[in-house]
Curated annotation (Swiss-Prot):
Catalyzes the addition and repair of the essential 3'-terminal CCA sequence in tRNAs without using a nucleic acid template. Adds these three nucleotides in the order of C, C, and A to the tRNA nucleotide-73, using CTP and ATP as substrates and producing inorganic pyrophosphate. tRNA 3'-terminal CCA addition is required both for tRNA processing and repair. Also involved in tRNA surveillance by mediating tandem CCA addition to generate a CCACCA at the 3' terminus of unstable tRNAs. While stable tRNAs receive only 3'-terminal CCA, unstable tRNAs are marked with CCACCA and rapidly degraded. The gene is cca. Belongs to the tRNA nucleotidyltransferase/poly(A) polymerase family. Bacterial CCA-adding enzyme type 1 subfamily. Residues 228-329 form the HD domain. The keyword DNA damage does not apply. NCBIfam families: PRK10885.1. This is Multifunctional CCA protein. The lineage of its organism: Bacteria, Pseudomonadati, Pseudomonadota, Gammaproteobacteria, Oceanospirillales. A single active site specifically recognizes both ATP and CTP and is responsible for their addition. The keyword Nucleotide-binding applies. Disulfide bonds: none annotated. Gene3D superfamilies: Beta Polymerase, domain 2 (3.30.460.10), cca-adding enzyme, domain 2 (1.10.3090.10).
Length: 422
């Protein structure tokens, strides 16, 4: 039996990047031999073992044969006569189909190193099309290595389009879609993930609400980039500069879903798109089973981003209602994430990338002002029940009025009815 370091560890080592996880392939062994040497079996579908000391994963070399739809419809053969090249052949990309023996010798039957140096993401074999998950994986790799100049090979993109045309993407579970997506959101350039999905015609299947934004115009005065889909990707790009939080990036990306269903005769205006978008955001986040904070923040950004942009103009009572709607008193940390998503939206426009966004600091000040009203003090003064709530509200509004006079004295006030907070 012979073991080889494979996959991402070899790829990243050759790129000069830190190697986080090391996976091994074992050739010429049986499960019984692995157990006899002290390895612990952990794989259910095919034999994967943990090294008795390092606890690194060691998988028996295997081949996979398509037996049904989706990414789970495979029959595995892990007999001892499976060669290393047989195992590498089943992998998705050439840069992931390299191996290294214990002496550091590279095994590269599919020219992965050449593609690595050329910065190309290329499929190993036509069997690439047998696994629909690879569409998302390639998009994620494209986003992960975009800053190094990697692009998807045209012939690989064609196979991704073929997978989409086959309808196989519908076999992907929500969990796998979200797993790939949230990993992409954590990369330096997640915009590339969604762009590659669009180029592969897969965005319409995976995120149809987002795909619907492309080709929808906005008012050039406020959106020189015009296209709503492009604006959404630009907002995501700006969110990456403002925060490493995947929740902020996701919220910035899908805040304008309501514009995708605006009747064409109303273009380029999108009246009430914030409220219209709420159901679309709910549908998307529930379909992909996004975690609770992702869903909450995306809904807030969708429903209230216009209020945030116009914060300096809003009346004191409307500002207090906005903070109440965002549950800012009890969840100030989430409100801060909301402000970052709104700032990303404002800056995600051609020519606006470097412009200041005073609304965020203004609303931070409004929240801090309201937090100085202590309910305990009012209780001590005898306020209870409904009277207590009314007095807290009255004092918050009065305090915000004074704050506005000091910090936004020249802003033209607009009532809550103008932004849907009546």
């Amino acid at each position: 039996m012979q073991r080889y370091l494979v996959g991402g560890a070899v790829r990243d080592a050759l790129l000069g990047l830190p190697v986080k996880d090391r996976d091994w392939v074992v050739v010429g062994a049986t499960p019984e031999q692995m157990l006899d040497q002290g390895y612990q079996q952990v794989g259910a579908d095919f034999p994967v073992f943990l090294h008795p000391e390092s606890k690194e994963e060691h998988a028996l070399a295997r081949t996979e044969r398509k037996s049904g739809k989706g990414y789970t419809g495979f029959i595995c053969d892990f007999s001892p006569d499976i060669s290393l090249e047989d195992d590498l052949l089943r992998r998705d990309l050439t840069i992931n189909a390299m191996a290294m023996d214990d002496d550091g010798n590279l095994v590269d039957p599919f020219n992965g190193r050449q593609d690595l140096e050329a910065r190309i993401l290329r499929h190993v074999s036509p069997a690439f099309t047998e696994d629909p998950l690879r569409v998302l994986r390639v998009a994620r790799f494209a986003s992960r290595y975009a800053d190094l100049g990697f692009t998807v090979a045209p012939e690989t993109l064609q196979l991704m389009q073929d997978i989409q045309a086959s309808g196989e993407l519908k076999a992907l579970t929500a969990e796998r879609v979200w797993q790939e997506t949230v990993r992409a959101l954590g990369q330096k350039q997640p915009r590339v993930y969604f762009q590659v999905l669009k180029d592969a015609h897969a965005l319409q299947d995976i995120f149809p609400e987002l795909n619907a934004l492309f080709g929808v115009p906005q008012t050039p005065q406020y959106h020189p980039e015009v296209d709503t889909g492009l604006h959404s990707l630009m907002a995501l790009e700006q969110a990456c500069l403002l925060s490493e939080r995947e929740e902020v990036r996701f919220a910035a990306l899908i805040h304008d879903l309501g514009k995708g269903v605006t009747p064409q005769e109303e273009w380029p205006k999108h009246h009430n798109h914030e409220a219209v978008g709420v159901d679309l955001v709910k549908a998307l986040t529930e379909r992909v089973k996004a975690p609770k904070l992702f869903k909450e923040l995306a809904l807030m950004a969708c429903q209230y981003h216009t209020h945030c942009h116009r914060a300096l103009e809003l009346r004191a009572n409307t500002l207090v209602k906005l903070l109440q709607s965002c549950d800012a008193w009890r969840r100030p940390d989430r409100f801060e994430l909301f402000l970052l998503a709104c700032e990303a939206d404002a800056r995600g426009r051609t020519g606006w990338e470097q412009k200041p966004y005073p609304q965020a600091d203004f609303l931070r000040g409004v929240l801090e002002t309201c937090q100085q009203i202590q309910p305990q003090e009012l209780v001590a003064q005898g306020y209870t029940g409904a009277r207590l709530g009314e007095e807290i509200q009255r004092r918050r509004i009065s305090a915000v009025k004074r704050f506005k006079q000091d910090n936004a004295p020249e802003a033209q006030e607009k009532g809550g009815e103008d932004v849907g907070l009546t």
